[in-house]
Amino acid sequence: MSRRTVAKKRPVAPDPVYQSRLVSLLVSHLLKKGKKSIAYNIFYAAMKNIAETTSQDPLEVLRQAVLNITPKVEVKSRRVGGATLQVPLEVKADRGTALALRWLLIAARNRSGRNMVSKLSAEIIDASNNTGAAIRRREETHRMAEANKAFAHFRF
């Protein structure tokens, strides 16, 4: 194993419009080929779309969506004897948020639609209402953990 010290978490600067660290994390996951300004434009257009559609605070809709998607448990492969077991583990807060953002964007990209703005806003609205592909992904992860609860004593 490495003898190096554990890398420190770098602080995430809040975004310029909403002053939210969550928005910065989402935009960082959204960007492609380092084009952050385009990612911000897509995100802010999606937030405007959410505000028009739901007539609610778009930041609150986003927070609720991320909260709904965040998994509580996940499974991790562990080799015991000759078999590879799926061991359920609790998800830490930072990892849970990262997984939620990743799943939200994957679901938005896989959605059918004209552009990323409409797909992202529709997925965020669906997730805030506990529907959509990202929510299904979280439920599938929870089902896997529930099915493998017998192996929970194999801690890491």
From Swiss-Prot:
Keywords: Chloroplast, Plastid, Ribonucleoprotein, Ribosomal protein, RNA-binding, rRNA-binding
CDD domains on file: uS7_Chloroplast
GO molecular function terms attached to this record: rRNA binding; structural constituent of ribosome
rRNA-binding is among the record's keywords: yes
Localization, UniProt: Plastid, Chloroplast
Disulfide bond recorded as keyword: no
Pfam family, one: Ribosomal_S7
First-listed, main subcellular location of the protein, grouped into a coarse class: plastid
Disulfide linkage: none
SUPFAM superfamilies: Ribosomal protein S7
GO cellular component: chloroplast; small ribosomal subunit
Cleavable signal peptide: none
Record's subunit section: Part of the 30S ribosomal subunit.
Protein purpose: One of the primary rRNA binding proteins, it binds directly to 16S rRNA where it nucleates assembly of the head domain of the 30S subunit.
Family indicated by similarity: Belongs to the universal ribosomal protein uS7 family.
Protein name (record): Small ribosomal subunit protein uS7c
Lineage of the species this protein comes from: Eukaryota, Viridiplantae, Chlorophyta, Mamiellophyceae, Mamiellales
